[in-house]
Regions:
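Short beta-strand/loop motif that positions the catalytic acidic residue
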Residues: 274, 280-282
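C-terminal, loop-rich substrate-recognition/catalytic regions characterized by aromatic stacking residues
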Residues: 219-235, 321, 326-615
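N-terminal cap/lid segment of alpha/beta-hydrolase-fold proteins
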Residues: 27-58, 459-465, 528, 532
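Alpha/beta-hydrolase fold nucleophile elbow
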Residues: 141-153
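Accessory cap/linker subdomain of secreted extracellular hydrolases
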Residues: 80, 88, 110-126, 161-273
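Glycine-rich nucleophile elbow surrounding the catalytic serine of serine-hydrolase chemistry
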Residues: 151-161
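Cap/lid segment of the alpha/beta-hydrolase catalytic domain
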Residues: 53-138, 187-188, 323-334, 452, ...
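Active-site-adjacent alpha-helix of alpha/beta-hydrolase-fold enzymes
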Residues: 291-309
Length: 615
């Protein structure tokens, strides 16, 4: 089916396919381009563009950028304009369509599972990268036999795959927002809850065509909230739309639990050593893969004897580090050009140091941009260990929130709401358009749910001093449901003063700094879900991967709790069904949810608070 160029490029942009840099005024060094079909060990050939500096007075390192989204047809001058920071330093830049995509041969398998390293005849993205490096070293003139690989999102996942069975010449890996576990916390699931709208649209985009499919061919409604609600049972997706043509959807539907398929696809079994210097990059408001780079850093860190595993987290959405200044996201102003700072002062020095042997990268163990305070913080360890104390933010009566434990109560104290799958809470303001709003929804003003009776909001008094939260946050929810299954969504929010002098339009703004969901059926086991005992208090721990935020004096802290987040998260029937994808409309029911806040069932948010060092 033919697709217009405008549609194609929209979806390329949405998925952030390019590892790109914003053009900058710099003396550009010309490239010469050579196109090649590089053979893999099984005979499949991969479409590759090689851009080498025109000058030959020195040998240059090779930087590989692999993608499933199409490498395009950039001229040497266009590439020089697109990557000025790297152009001025001198790199051989290699772009490659992965197996089965665009002009490369073979069969595409989305997020192909790692092969057994002992099976030298099997192929995966690691072996394809190895074979590509081997060919480049032998066939590209003036290379210095040092190779790096970099990418964003899927491209970052490909970069991490290169580490599993690395070529000896691999000397640097830059993974920017790589997924690490598609069931636990990245694109397709969060703590067992299926990311419906993203999963459906992305799977269609990737698997309905060898190029880029357009989800508007399926979703023809102005407000996608309405389309997904009318969809009814998720079984209707396969019956009415996909009809066996989208393999990943079948995986979603047939493997709802954390089975060996998802575990083998995750990086946890494989990342047991640091095989190359690694720069892990994340964005605080990454709407797709915030969990991944944090998890990859944590998996590698115990094995990092040579101190070559680094973490950088900035105030970005998915791919925000690679384009523009990075001064604002939505309405949130960070006071400086954070993306430019990353590219010029972190990324390029890292690559130059490890691939050219020049200078020092100057990186600490971890570097985070502290939102609220709008400053870069250098850490000796992540999460921070010095000058940090664990504190608890307790839910209180009258929808208050404070660090003080609730007073003893003769009876269990709770707040309640009714959750209705027929009227789920939208995850962002409606209409939820297919072609806009996705990249900034995590920084939307959360006041759009103020009128909803199925959202509980607990808020503190105005702070008398700054409260800095840095590290891992865990929501401890003591809750019951009248049903036998339930989702629990918890959001931590910075509430701006009603009168915000520096920017009056931001008065009262509610900025979500952390939020996630937990599917109740997985409380005891992610592998073997169980019905929740009705009307019985259960303790749910909902982890947030990381945070570094300053709640400023005069601001307030808010915690919101709800049980639907639609359609980013599929609807829970609130009645235990062994496979929610097979739930019928008659299985969906309302449920009365209770959030407890006293005695041993005192719901709270555990936060690591930065304290002043002793004098």
């Amino acid at each position: 089916m033919n697709r217009s160029p405008a549609r194609r490029w929209f979806w390329l942009w949405l998925a952030l396919i390019w590892f790109t840099f914003t053009p900058a005024s710099a003396q550009q060094e010309p490239f010469k381009r050579v196109d090649a079909m590089i053979p893999m060990r099984d005979g499949v050939r991969l479409n590759t563009h090689i851009y080498s500096p025109a000058r030959t007075d020195e040998q240059f390192p090779i930087l590989i950028l692999r993608t499933p989204y199409g490498i395009g047809n950039a001229t040497p001058s266009q590439l020089a304009t697109a990557v000025p920071e790297l152009t001025s330093e001198g790199f051989i830049i290699v772009q490659q369509d992965i197996r089965g995509r665009f002009n490369s041969e073979g069969r595409f398998v989305m997020l192909r599972q790692p092969r057994d390293p002992k099976d030298k005849n099997a192929v995966d993205e690691s072996s394809d990268t190895y074979d590509t490096i081997e060919w480049l070293l032998k066939n590209v003139a003036n290379n210095n036999r040092r190779v790096g690989i970099a990418g964003t999102s899927y491209g970052a996942w490909l970069a991490v795959m290169a580490m599993l069975d690395p070529h000896p010449a691999l000397n640097a890996v830059v993974e920017q927002a790589s997924p690490a576990d598609m069931w636990m916390g990245d694109d397709f699931h969060h703590n067992g809850a299926f990311r419906l709208s993203y999963g459906l649209e992305y799977a269609y985009m990737m698997e309905s065509s060898k190029e880029i499919g357009d989800p508007s061919e399926v979703i023809d409604t102005f407000d996608t909230y309405e389309w997904y609600l009318k969809l009814g049972s998720l079984a209707n997706v396969e019956t009415n739309y996909f009809r066996g043509k989208i393999p990943s959807w079948r995986d979603f539907a047939n493997r709802p639990d954390y089975d060996d398929f998802w575990k083998r696809q995750a990086f946890a079994p494989w990342l047991n050593k640091v095989t190359a210097p690694t720069l892990n990059v994340a964005g605080w408001w990454d709407q797709e893969d915030f969990y991944g780079p944090i998890k990859i850093y944590e998996l590698l860190e115990p094995h990092d004897k040579a101190n070559q595993n680094f973490l950088v987290v900035g105030p970005w959405n998915h791919g925000g580090w690679s384009r523009g200044e990075g001064r604002k996201l939505g309405k949130i102003d960070f006071g400086s050009a954070t993306a430019e700072h990353y590219r010029r002062n972190i990324l390029v020095p890292f690559l130059v140091h490890y691939l050219k042997g020049k200078g020092t990268h100057g990186l600490p163990e971890a570097m985070t941009f502290r939102t609220g305070a709008n400053e870069w913080i250098r850490h000796h360890a992540w999460p921070p260990k010095q000058n940090v104390v664990d504190r608890k933010l307790y839910l209180q009566k009258d929808k208050e929130l404070s660090f003080d434990p609730p007073p003893p109560a003769a009876e269990q104290s709770f707040d309640s709401y009714t959750s209705d799958p027929a009227n789920p809470v939208p995850y962002r303001p409606r209409p939820i358009k297919l072609r806009s709003g996705w990249t900034t929804w995590l920084v939307e003003d959360q006041r759009f749910v103020d009128h909803r009776p199925d959202v509980l909001s607990f808020v503190s008094e105005p702070l008398i001093e700054d409260v800095i939260v840095s590290g891992r946050i865990v929501a401890n929810l003591f809750a019951s449901t009248s049903g036998t299954d339930s989702d629990w969504v918890v959001k931590l929010i910075d509430v701006y003063p009603d009168k915000f002098e520096s920017d009056p339009e931001m008065g009262g703004f509610q900025l979500m700094i952390a939020g996630d969901v937990f599917r109740g059926r997985y409380l005891r086991s992610f592998e073997r879900p169980q019905a929740i005992p009705a009307n019985t208090v259960q303790h749910y721990q909902i982890p947030f991967p990381a945070n570094d935020h300053a709640f400023k004096k005069g601001h307030r802290i808010m915690v919101q709790i709800q049980s639907t987040w639609f359609p980013i998260i599929d609807r829970n029937p609130q009645r235990f069904i062994s496979n929610i994808f097979l739930a019928r409309e008659s299985d969906f029911q309302t449920a009365i949810q209770r959030i407890y806040r006293s005695g041993r069932n005192a719901s709270h948010i555990a936060v690591p608070v930065v304290v002043k060092p002793p004098q």
